[in-house]
A protein has these predicted regions:
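A residue-level marker of the well-folded mature domains of exported/periplasmic proteins
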Residues: 1-253
Length: 253
């Protein structure tokens, strides 16, 4: 970034905020909102009880923003005494094995008395759910996720993962390209927000993330072709597959 600025080249931070730097613009999904959606989904379904928080990589700024959003929602319930956080951990490099280890420890500490696990993405959700399976608790504890990856979507329809958060790639890529061209041409931009990166308030366009659960998975990630119905429901008996129109099956022409 410093080298580009010395040459008067504008810099766009694309989907990852560059900390403590003089970037000109930032585009991503509203990552604080992602965390809020995760926590709100779980809190609506488990308003009281013991919670486990599994964050992502502690060196990833996005992970910090997800946690900020999660705490925006959970803090009032914690203050009321409705929610008790029995473990608050970070998964190095977003590794499922880290989430597995942290969740195993949390379940031991809480004697399996856990109602919800706020996992910050689908890979950490997968590790947490593995720990739940070992205790016969999979599907009995609410678990969040994010990224709508195939394994996460499979767990959603299987009922072991409660939800995921979908961030459509197409609008991010197209808007990012438009912004890059406008920056190169020194054309004015219309941000819809700003994010402080430790050096400055960076003007930003923050796109809306989408909550996905078993009730809308066909109409969202499958309809968009992000994942295919036959892949998502691979582990579900065919007679239990949803009846959908061809355009909703996720099969591209």
């Amino acid at each position: 970034v410093d080298s580009a600025k010395r040459e008067n080249v504008p810099v766009l931070a694309y989907d990852r905020l560059v900390r403590n730097s003089d970037v000109d613009f930032y585009i991503s999904f509203d990552n604080v909102k992602v965390g809020e959606l995760q926590a709100r989904y779980l809190l609506d379904r488990a308003p009281k009880g013991n919670y486990v928080l599994i964050g992502g990589s502690p060196t990833d700024n996005n992970a910090r923003m997800f946690r900020e959003g999660q705490m925006n929602v959970l803090t009032p319930a914690i203050s009321r005494g409705d929610v008790h956080v029995v473990a608050d951990q970070w998964a190095k490099d977003w590794l499922p094995s880290e989430a597995l280890r942290h969740t195993e420890n949390a379940l031991t500490q809480a004697q399996n008395n856990v109602v919800a696990i706020v996992a910050s993405n689908d890979s950490t959700a997968g590790g947490a759910i593995q720990a739940l399976e070992e205790q016969g608790l999979a599907g009995k504890v609410f678990v969040s996720g994010q990224d709508a990856d195939l394994a996460g979507c499979q767990r959603v329809v299987a009922g072991t993962q409660s939800m995921t958060v979908y961030k459509p790639i197409a609008p991010l890529a197209s808007r990012g390209a438009e912004i890059a061209v406008s920056l190169a041409r020194h054309e004015p931009l219309q941000p819809n927000g700003k994010v402080n990166n430790g050096f400055k308030d960076v003007p930003a366009i923050l796109l809306e993330p989408i909550v996905v659960d078993k009730n809308n998975i066909v109409q969202t990630v499958i309809a968009d072709g992000f994942v295919r119905l036959q892949d998502v429901f691979r582990n579900v008996p065919p007679d239990q597959w949803p009846k959908v129109a061809p355009k909703e099956s996720g099969t591209r022409p």
